[in-house]
């Protein structure tokens, strides 16, 4: 099988592991920097060039598209899709996942529980908007933030109003959510591949922080995800159209709540903590999917 990986940096851990896993299983693997890809779109067909040469014959593509190049990266991925290349995470699914508001709407429509979320635009409605959410603390999130960036905890109603008004002044898109205190700064990262959770870890925020992201100083241990948590994780990925996803849950009094569905989850943390060959599971999923489409 001929596999392309859309990535701007071949030295990143996740990219290197996917290369290793693909070649170990006997496949040809090539890295394509999405920003060096350019395309021809016409009624008579689609074509893609990379550094002066046509790109053809790929059976599958694994998108590792950074948030800063989402629009161009997904356009390149969409071109490959139109050229008949299989991808576990289609371009439209990545765009759904990276828009937090849209993702939460889609999850809620499937009956998947999450922290109560509000969204509004007019400054005159701020007080009523926050009253729909309930008393503070509140969590304010940039709509397209990543890796814990653009996430603010406000402990008083006045602070919530001030942050909301400041973000509106910057023309930033954001959502506001209820704060789940019983989670105590911990969440569960479930790594979904296909129709199963292949690994799960419990992440704990650093002292004085409420964000559990590892690159912000959080710690992680192997987690024994319950059957319900695994089911919610798989349903969440499926609701957005993703076959490979990192689904972040928190354990609450009313059960597991989905915080986010990440369409480009890093492999270093989960493989290091859980000792699971996640990259190999992704390549195996590609093999099975391409084989099914050929039958």
UniProtKB/Swiss-Prot annotation:
This is Probable alpha-L-glutamate ligase. GO terms for molecular function: ATP binding; metal ion binding; ribosomal S6-glutamic acid ligase activity. Binds 2 magnesium or manganese ions per subunit. Its EC number is 6.3.2.-. ATP binds at residues 141, 178-179, 187, 211-213. It comes from Xanthomonas oryzae pv. oryzae (strain KACC10331 / KXO85). Disulfide bonds: none annotated. The gene is rimK. Mg(2+) 2 binds at residues 260, 262. It comes from the Bacteria. Gene3D superfamilies: 3.40.50.20, ATP-grasp fold, A domain, ATP-grasp fold, B domain. One of its GO terms (cellular component) is cytoplasm.
């Amino acid at each position: 099988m001929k596999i392309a990986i859309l990535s701007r940096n071949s030295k990143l851990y996740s990219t290197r592991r996917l290369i290793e896993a693909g070649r170990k299983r006997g496949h040809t693997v090539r890295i394509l920097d999405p920003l060096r890809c350019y395309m021809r779109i016409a009624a008579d067909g689609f074509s893609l060039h990379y550094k002066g040469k046509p790109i053809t014959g790929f059976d599958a593509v694994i998108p590792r598209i950074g948030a800063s190049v989402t629009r161009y990266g997904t356009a390149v991925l969409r071109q490959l899709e139109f050229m008949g290349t299989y991808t576990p995470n289609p371009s439209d699914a990545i765009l759904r996942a990276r828009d937090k508001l849209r993702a939460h709407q889609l999850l809620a429509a499937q009956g998947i529980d999450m922290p109560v979320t509000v969204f509004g635009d007019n400054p005159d409605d701020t007080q009523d908007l926050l009253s729909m959410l309930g008393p503070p603390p509140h969590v304010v999130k940039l709509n397209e933030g990543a890796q814990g960036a653009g996430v603010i905890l406000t402990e008083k109603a006045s602070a919530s109003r001030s942050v909301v008004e400041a973000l509106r002044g910057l023309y930033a898109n954001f959502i506001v959510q209820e704060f789940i205190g019983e989670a105590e700064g911990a969440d569960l990262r479930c790594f979904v591949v296909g129709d199963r959770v292949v690994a799960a870890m419990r992440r704990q925020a650093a002292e004085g922080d409420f964000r559990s992201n590892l690159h912000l100083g959080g710690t992680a241990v192997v987690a024994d995800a319950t059957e319900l948590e695994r089911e919610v994780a798989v349903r969440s990925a499926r609701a957005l159209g993703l076959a490979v996803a990192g689904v972040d849950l928190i354990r609450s009094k009313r059960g597991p709540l989905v915080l986010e569905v990440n369409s480009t989850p890093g492999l270093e943390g989960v493989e290091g903590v859980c000792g699971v060959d996640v990259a190999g599971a992704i390549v195996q999923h590609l093999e099975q999917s391409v084989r099914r489409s050929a039958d």
